[in-house]
Amino acid sequence: IRDRLRSRGLGDVYKRQVATILHCEMNGLELPEGYGILHHEEGIDILPANIELSGVEVSLVNVMSREYVLKQFIKTISPEYDYILIDNMPSLGMLTVNALAAADSVIIPVMAHYLPVKGLEQLMQTIYKVRKQINRKLQIDGILLTMVDRRTNFSKEIIELLHDNYGEYINIFKTAIPFSIRAAETSAEGVSIYKHDPKGRVAEAYKKLVEEVIGDGSERK
């Protein structure tokens, strides 16, 4: 993957990670404007992360106002963007709390498997706790089903279980992201699903999801 980044002119800045930026925020160090932000050829900006981010979690324990470190950084760049997406690891640690503290709203992706659905309850408790104690404006946009294979009874049972347990009080998006090998290939290729498989089912599903989440965008700006 690093070779592909170099071929796109991104190799030299790949070492500039979210971890570096958060460490600077924790220590009150200033960074050059736009530090670490990669301008992708498909028209979006990306701030990458790697395994070093795990070490940040340990460092956050002893930091004053540790829940707001990510929010402090996002404040410095938010005027430049209409939307900022924070992609979290499946974890309930301090990094996730930082993301929830910085966010306006949450989309909860859940794979159509038993264990992810089972773990959803703990995540919901974390979200409600953050909303009560840290970020009162935090909203839940909805639950997004991913890697769905509607050909199997198992997927159908998981979807039914999710609707039974959460459908009455949390929005479950009508759009579900189907399972696709072509979609799994995009990470290795370093391109989006719209470039790798623009006419595929996954690309079409994400287009529908965008329409479902933001419509024409007027209510979100």
What are these regions (language model features)?
Residues 2-221:
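P-loop NTP-binding core
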